Regions:
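A structural-propensity feature for long, helix-poor, extended segments
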Residues: 68-80, 86, 297-323, 327, ...
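Short helix-coil transition sites and intra-membrane helix breaks within transmembrane domains
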Residues: 33-42, 80-91, 123-127, 263-273, ...
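Helix-loop-helix hairpins and the membrane-proximal interhelical loops
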Residues: 1-58, 139, 191-298, 383, ...
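Membrane-interface alpha-helices at helix entry/exit sites of multi-pass transporters
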Residues: 58-62, 99-116, 288-300, 332, ...
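Transmembrane alpha-helix interface/packing and boundary motifs in multi-pass membrane proteins
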Residues: 27-41, 71-83, 158-163, 258-267, ...
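Membrane-embedded alpha-helical segments of transport systems
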Residues: 69-74, 115-127, 179, 300-317, ...
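Membrane-embedded alpha-helical modules
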Residues: 111-227, 340-494
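Re-entrant/interfacial helical elements at transmembrane boundaries that shape
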Residues: 41-51, 64, 79-99, 130, ...
């Protein structure tokens, strides 16, 4: 009965004209940035953070969430039609999706992707609703040492599951923790890393950093790598998949949904890891006798990954909503949005702001319905948007970013910080470093330090307090095992292969 009462609270919050509008705006923007190669949900959410300051917290979170899971839908469109993933998680969809388009079956591929995404999204939302309250009750048992260990696990997970070099991911985490130390120490009042700059006394602004690393850097990166795009196929064909397509895809959709739902909860997991894991699983299950072979237009190569990335995108909200721990860069930005509204992330959100908590969960069901409507009947509109020249798109984004950053504190210094981090983000990207650990570390670093200090204060400086507690010790043990496994040569080579196209 408690779950039904909570869902009723959620429906009362989500099914209002204002929140329905923001849900629709969010999923529409998400589909748009998913369709347009070079954009993505992280950059878009970062750019829209300043706008959310003027919105009701529920409306803001509903819109930002819609952008994230909406982008997973839209990313498949460009992957199938032009062989360019609009969103990173859609990389593997290119392998079979575009082959199907070349065979004149683009409509079937798009239809299966949309239906698989809808089923996975609805299932994942049910999981969030079912497990949110039990996990939140467990989180209330957490003290400073448990939170410290949980944040260590979050940072280790971000390192282990980040694409590319393990050492580079660790380096990005250390840099982000140092950046989180900038400003006045709240305990001692000492100034750290301000270098005589008064504007840095309050620390680096999260919006400026995230918008620089993802907004400005993304523009520089795409202009630097500007190239020609393949022509969009002239005819998409019938969008609704046939009964045969649905029958062939049913198993892949089911497996992708379950796999994505589980992997989405992991720190650093989410949609990207889920889609790669699903494609690998389907390929292994089919074996060498698959007809057609994977990579040559097998519908399961579209159904599995698209279901997995949507399920993973939505279950990644579980640790953010229940524990206040972001599992990926978008969730870190969502926590930033909560902080903008003076809402402390963590298990107390469900008790102090139940309409926000349950309204967000219910809005995901509504958003999935909106996305089916947007992605099947309006496919022709998204195809036309693929022809928008980048030289017109990026100046508008640049102006929007600048206005957004300035509007938070009305401080020109924030614009310089954004430009600086834009250049920094572009440089580290050129060096093969992923920026997601930087955002996660910047959010978790200060929380890690604060909980470590509290735990040591309560234990009178006894460092063994972190390993003597059953929950804290277990979390640290899991972190150590994950790190050791990632260092092993066989695991490391498998990890690197997971993020490379076959």
């Amino acid at each position: 009965m408690d779950l039904l009462n909570n869902l009723l609270i959620g429906f009362q919050s989500a099914v209002t004209l204002t929140n329905l509008l923001y849900c629709f705006v969010g999923v529409s923007l998400g589909t748009l940035v998913g369709v347009l190669p070079g954009m993505g949900p992280v950059a878009t959410v970062a750019m829209l953070l300043p706008i959310t300051y003027a919105l009701d917290p529920s409306s803001a979170l509903i819109m930002l969430a819609g952008i994230y899971y909406g982008a997973q839908y839209g990313g498949s469109t460009t992957a199938i039609l032009v062989n360019i993933p609009g969103e990173a998680a859609a990389v593997v969809t290119c392998l079979d999706g575009h082959k199907l388009a070349k065979l004149g079956r683009a409509g079937a591929a798009l239809g299966v992707a949309a239906f698989g995404s809808f089923i996975a999204g609805c299932f994942a939302t049910v999981l969030i609703a079912a497990f949110a309250e039990p996990l939140t009750l467990v989180a209330f048992e957490f003290g400073p040492r448990e939170y410290f260990s949980l944040m260590v696990l979050g940072l280790v997970g971000a390192v282990v599951l980040a694409s590319g070099s393990l050492l580079k991911a660790i380096g990005m985490i250390f840099i982000s923790i140092l950046l989180g130390c900038v400003g006045m120490d709240v305990n001692s009042g000492a100034l750290r890393y301000v270098f005589g700059v008064d504007e840095l006394m309050d620390g680096l602004d999260f919006v400026a950093l995230s918008m620089g690393v993802y907004g400005f850097a993304e523009i520089i990166r795409n202009l630097d790598a500007a190239g020609s795009r393949e022509a969009v196929p002239a005819a998409v064909g019938k969008v609704l998949p046939s009964a045969k397509d649905l029958k062939e895809s049913a198993g892949a959709i089911s497996r992708g949904t379950i796999l994505g739902s589980l992997l989405g909860i992991l720190p650093g997991g989410g949609a990207l890891l889920s889609s790669f894991a699903s494609y690998t699983l389907e390929k292994k299950l089919a074996g060498k006798n698959a007809r057609p072979p994977f990579g040559e237009g097998n519908i399961r190569g579209v159904a599995g990954p698209e279901s997995a990335n949507n399920a993973g995108a939505q279950t990644s909200f579980i640790p953010m909503l229940t524990l206040g721990i972001p599992s990926n860069a978008v969730m870190a930005l969502m926590i930033g949005a909560l902080m903008l509204h003076d809402i402390a992330p963590g298990p107390q959100v469900m008790t102090t702001n139940p309409s926000l908590f349950w309204g967000l969960i219910v809005s995901m069901w509504i958003g999935n319905v909106f996305l089916v409507i947007l992605n099947i009947p309006l496919i022709g509109l998204w195809v036309k948007l693929l022809r928008v020249p980048y030289r017109l798109l990026y100046p508008a984004i640049l102006v929007f970013c600048t206005i957004g950053v300035y509007s938070i504190n009305n401080n020109p210094f924030d614009i310089w910080i954004t430009i600086g981090f834009g250049i920094f983000g572009w440089i580290v990207n050129k060096l093969g470093c992923e920026c997601a650990p930087l955002i996660l570390g910047f959010i978790l670093g200060p929380m890690l330090e604060e909980n470590m200090r509290r735990a040591l204060l309560l234990s009178r400086g006894d460092l063994t307090t972190f390993v003597t507690g059953p929950i804290s010790g277990s979390l640290l043990a899991v972190s150590a095992v994950l790190l050791l496994l990632a260092i092993l040569p066989s695991v490391r080579s498998g990890r690197e292969k997971a993020f490379v196209e076959d």
